[in-house]
Amino acid sequence: MMGSKIQFKRPDGSFCDAYLSAQQQGRPGVVVIQEWWGLNDQICGIADRMARAGFNAIAPDLYHGRVTDKADEANHLMSGLDFPGATHQDIRGAVQHLKTNGSSKVAVMGYCMGGALTIASAVHIPELDAGVCFYGIPPKEFADPAAIRIPLQGHFANRDDWCTPAAADGLEASLKACGANYELYRYDANHGFCNDRSAVNYDPASCNLAFERLQVFLSKHLA
């Protein structure tokens, strides 16, 4: 890993642990939101990849040190997460940290659970400039996509039984109806196709194509 563990201050004044992979002052920022496994090496690796692409990247530890590779435990951790607190405190605090440390524009990107939190962040965090969501959508009562006022890019899998194609259709319909600035892409892949630790779901061709699209999108909207 090329970054380091840090702490940043949340809006409520308390602190949150995070992994920071910084490029240099003045570069645009990206907050990378974990999957339901926790802040593991795979998510830190994505932050490193974003740093190599020219961004200052930070991944907040939403589970406060807890990490697992077992689905049952991951589901338990996700079910116990305070989603409003994660959005309004941890993720917003990470956005503010990047902005106060030289990134004039900041995006949030996330996978699975983090994808749902990306949409929630796009709705609720006023300092945010763009969002990139991978195969995750929050309940509409928590974060209505019709309220999004920043550019949003979405990446979804056609063979996904967690964030289903029908759910992606519903998201697109909401974004289209409110005139949102959005891009939505679909891949002939499984849920989690960007997780290179998953022998079953990882699809390098789809993942690399999504990353290319992400870079173009962020370069445009964070310039």
Segments (PLM) and residue ranges:
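N-terminal cap/leader regions of alpha/beta-hydrolase-fold enzymes
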Residues: 1-223
